[in-house]
Amino acid sequence: MSVADVALSPIHRGSAFAVGGFGQSTTTHYSVKSVLVFLSVSGSTMPMLILESDSIAEVKLRIQTCNGFRVRRQKLVFSGRELARNASRVKDYGVTGGSVLHLVLKLYDPLLVTVITTCGKVFQFHVDRRRNVGYLKKRISKEGKGFPEVDDQEILFKGEKLDDNRIIDGICKDGNSVIHLLVKKSVEDTVKREEDTATGKDSLLEPVVLNPDVKLPEVLEDMIDRTVDGLNKGSPPVRSAEGTGGTYLMQDSSGLNYVSVFKPMDEEPMAVNNPQQLPVSSDGQGLKRGTRVGEGATREVAAYLLDHPKSGLRSVSKEVMGFAGVPPTAMVRSSHKVYNYPNGFSSCATKDAKVGSLQMFMKNNGSCEDIGPGAFPVEEVHKICVFDIRMANADRHAGNILTGKSEEGKTLLIPIDHGYCLPENFEDCTFEWLYWPQAKLPFSADTIDYINSLDSEQDIALLQLHGWNVPEAVSRTLRISTMLLKKGVERNLTPYQIGSVMCRETVNKDSAIEEIVREAHNSVLPASSEATFLEAVSVAMDRRLDELTK
């Protein structure tokens, strides 16, 4: 297991637990104002007592203080909903005494290490990125058949001899978790790849074509071809420690680089084959309100399609990257025994094929969690603001914005993880960039021109052309969010001002956009057309936005 997945089991009312932290000897019965959390890590369970009045941030900090699990590596889930608003109290989410929370922790984030010997033999294994080269040598000696002892090894990376104290994570700075190493010592010819990477005959990956009249762009064809080559050459998918769903890094034919990222529908959070052991959704609702389990892949593809380049619509532009820089994404079906098959892999590639999104792997220097937001270029932040507002993103945080460099050396922000875009309502819209200084600066003229070029009706038609029978509630969300963005720039509002209209201040207080929608709904007859309803939304929105400019 590469992730410590914590499924917290219900307890009986007479159970004893530690008060105020983990592993303490004090024994007490919980009160009606208390919440018991059982963390199961590596086979052991650790109880913790919190109060209903605690904020989510306080609970996470207490977990970090008591057991060292860093706050930013924690995700709390209750009753099928992520407790994402750190300033809100646990009771705002409906948590009461005796409730059971689910915690997912990322404790182990491995790198796939490829060792190539002087005689050309190849060996692969996973190494914790926090380990050093000395540890790597011990692993080579212990696990590699015929490899030399530690003292006889000399390891190089890109021609540079590596010191034993060098940290593995610091060697590979471009975000690619495959390190190519050379062992400068003769090794027996019996060294081979591990058996499970020797052949790709039981694997499958192919595009899902929903409309035969739509030709797959060359960039997506190339990404799929390179991914298939990797599988056929025996380079297995590598499960990522990131996220609450199944995410697999797909390698190229050399096994030295990642090409793409595969997210199966049936392994999404709260789906039936979710590898994180989160409970299966009882009503089909996703972790974010207004989304459904199993629809994340469709939304990932939609995000790329609607990220139009400055030069024009995605359907006619030849540019690979759009305005916001969403990586190229396609719908595929794939099978491999590395994926999560609770009932076992049958070795029948077609039978066990999973449908999901395949997104181009982007070289990066980490995420925005690793850098203070003050260092980000204003235009890079604003492009993400525009995208998130328009798509009503319900899951934008610093961890799903990667940082990179352009060919000219300029800082780039790369938005990923769009499975919770275009929800059916605005209840869970969250934009972390609201708290960044760039969000309080006005949009540039170029960005305003781009915003004014957007057309929600064309966007809906484009999604339908690519095979998504867009639910009416989703179409309405896109129409209203696009309307808000355009009306906002007409009034010279900043990203912060527009984004604040979409986001709730607390869990139980409706956002301004929700109030606008409700006002419009109450002002029209039940049988009114969508056009009539949207006109009512426009009137209510004008009044609310005008108040912001007074």
Curated annotation (Swiss-Prot):
<comment type="function">
    <text>The phosphorylation of phosphatidylinositol (PI) to PI4P is the first committed step in the generation of phosphatidylinositol 4,5-bisphosphate (PIP2), a precursor of the second messenger inositol 1,4,5-trisphosphate (InsP3).</text>
</comment>
<feature type="region of interest" description="G-loop">
    <location>
        <begin position="240"/>
        <end position="246"/>
    </location>
</feature>
<dbReference type="GO" id="GO:0005634">
    <property type="term" value="C:nucleus"/>
</dbReference>
<keyword id="KW-0067">ATP-binding</keyword>
<feature type="domain" description="PI3K/PI4K catalytic">
    <location>
        <begin position="234"/>
        <end position="532"/>
    </location>
</feature>
<dbReference type="GO" id="GO:0050821">
    <property type="term" value="P:protein stabilization"/>
</dbReference>
<feature type="region of interest" description="Catalytic loop">
    <location>
        <begin position="392"/>
        <end position="400"/>
    </location>
</feature>
<feature type="domain" description="Ubiquitin-like 1">
    <location>
        <begin position="34"/>
        <end position="111"/>
    </location>
</feature>
<feature type="region of interest" description="Disordered">
    <location>
        <begin position="228"/>
        <end position="247"/>
    </location>
</feature>
<dbReference type="GO" id="GO:0034051">
    <property type="term" value="P:negative regulation of plant-type hypersensitive response"/>
</dbReference>
<feature type="binding site">
    <location>
        <position position="417"/>
    </location>
    <ligand>
        <name>ATP</name>
    </ligand>
</feature>
<dbReference type="GO" id="GO:0005524">
    <property type="term" value="F:ATP binding"/>
</dbReference>
<feature type="binding site">
    <location>
        <position position="263"/>
    </location>
    <ligand>
        <name>ATP</name>
    </ligand>
</feature>
<keyword id="KW-0677">Repeat</keyword>
<feature type="domain" description="Ubiquitin-like 2">
    <location>
        <begin position="112"/>
        <end position="190"/>
    </location>
</feature>
<dbReference type="InterPro" id="IPR044571">
    <property type="entry name" value="P4KG1-8"/>
</dbReference>
<dbReference type="GO" id="GO:0048364">
    <property type="term" value="P:root development"/>
</dbReference>
<protein>
    <recommendedName>
        <fullName>Phosphatidylinositol 4-kinase gamma 2</fullName>
        <ecNumber>2.7.1.67</ecNumber>
    </recommendedName>
</protein>
<dbReference type="InterPro" id="IPR029071">
    <property type="entry name" value="Ubiquitin-like_domsf"/>
</dbReference>
<dbReference type="GO" id="GO:0009651">
    <property type="term" value="P:response to salt stress"/>
</dbReference>
<dbReference type="InterPro" id="IPR000626">
    <property type="entry name" value="Ubiquitin-like_dom"/>
</dbReference>
<keyword id="KW-0547">Nucleotide-binding</keyword>
<dbReference type="GO" id="GO:0005737">
    <property type="term" value="C:cytoplasm"/>
</dbReference>
<dbReference type="Pfam" id="PF00454">
    <property type="entry name" value="PI3_PI4_kinase"/>
</dbReference>
<feature type="region of interest" description="Activation loop">
    <location>
        <begin position="415"/>
        <end position="441"/>
    </location>
</feature>
<keyword id="KW-0472">Membrane</keyword>
<comment type="similarity">
    <text>Belongs to the PI3/PI4-kinase family. Type II PI4K subfamily.</text>
</comment>
<dbReference type="Pfam" id="PF00240">
    <property type="entry name" value="ubiquitin"/>
</dbReference>
<dbReference type="GO" id="GO:0004430">
    <property type="term" value="F:1-phosphatidylinositol 4-kinase activity"/>
</dbReference>
<feature type="binding site">
    <location>
        <begin position="241"/>
        <end position="247"/>
    </location>
    <ligand>
        <name>ATP</name>
    </ligand>
</feature>
<keyword id="KW-0418">Kinase</keyword>
<dbReference type="GO" id="GO:0016020">
    <property type="term" value="C:membrane"/>
</dbReference>
<feature type="binding site">
    <location>
        <begin position="359"/>
        <end position="362"/>
    </location>
    <ligand>
        <name>ATP</name>
    </ligand>
</feature>
<dbReference type="InterPro" id="IPR000403">
    <property type="entry name" value="PI3/4_kinase_cat_dom"/>
</dbReference>
<dbReference type="GO" id="GO:0000325">
    <property type="term" value="C:plant-type vacuole"/>
</dbReference>
<keyword id="KW-0808">Transferase</keyword>
